[in-house]
Amino acid sequence: MPESLTVLGIESSCDETAVAILRSAGEGKAPEILSSIISSQIAIHRRHGGVVPELASRNHSADLPGVIRAACREAGVTPADIDVFGATGGPGLVAALLVGNSTAKALALATGKPFVSVNHLEGHLLSPFLKRPGGPVPHLGMVVSGGHTLFVDVRGVGDYRLLGRSLDDAAGEAFDKVGKMLG
């Protein structure tokens, strides 16, 4: 494996189109965030009282090329400089996920680079360790995101044990609704 890798990741699981470019700093070291660009659809969906999946996917399709260009410009790279392309593989809105995955796969194919699908919930569980690789393991993780509420025993990357989950309404859903009510 090379000393460092430049990674472009696409997030399109719901109503935000996001692209981040990171450069790894080697084993056990925090990566450098070269760029992180987000295009929010909050104003679009607010008119409908919540996220409309078809609108979300159409807006991802419209926004993603510009968000990728902006992320590359801010990072000072071109798609040819990227070593690995990734995208949120799920869970999320199916059509929205397809937009992000298709785009990342097309870029990977066009540049001859690998593509990696990332589990959205695993991303949430591991995000606190972006700046502190390895972090305290094992630890208890809680994911409160949209329709998901999970309590997870995190043993390491890819090594998780589900301890519990909501059975009906998710805490993430309540969190989102309260946030919407507060503006």
Segments (PLM) and residue ranges:
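Short acidic/glycine-rich loops and adjacent helix/strand connectors
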Residues: M1-G183
